[in-house]
Amino acid sequence: MKTGDIFWVNLDPTVGDEIKKKRPVVVLNQGHEKNLKLSIVVPITGWKKHWEENPFFVVIKPGKSNRLQKKSVIDCFQIRAISHRRFMDRIGKITDKQMSDVKKAISLVLDIDSEDCQ
């Protein structure tokens, strides 16, 4: 499991407005936390036109490297740590540009300047 990998995971059970069900997620951490058996992820969900200007979403189109079936968004507002037991199959990987966009969106979600973190 590496940063930028896309996996199918089962996010159920959830509460309230948490994104749910079996869906793809992008892995954000490199797996250095070997004792934790947790990974930090952001979920992927189907594209909706009214999300066009949402700064927390990164658009991702289907392609050979990500192997997604439809235009989607990486929902950076729903960043979370999940157990490795939720992971199913590896689907693919996002591009370096998409990962950069994800990091920018997460810095907006968390209200931090990404340059301050370097």
Residue spans of the language-model regions?
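Conserved functional hotspots at enzyme active or ligand-binding sites that engage polyanionic ligands
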Residues: 1-23, 27-118
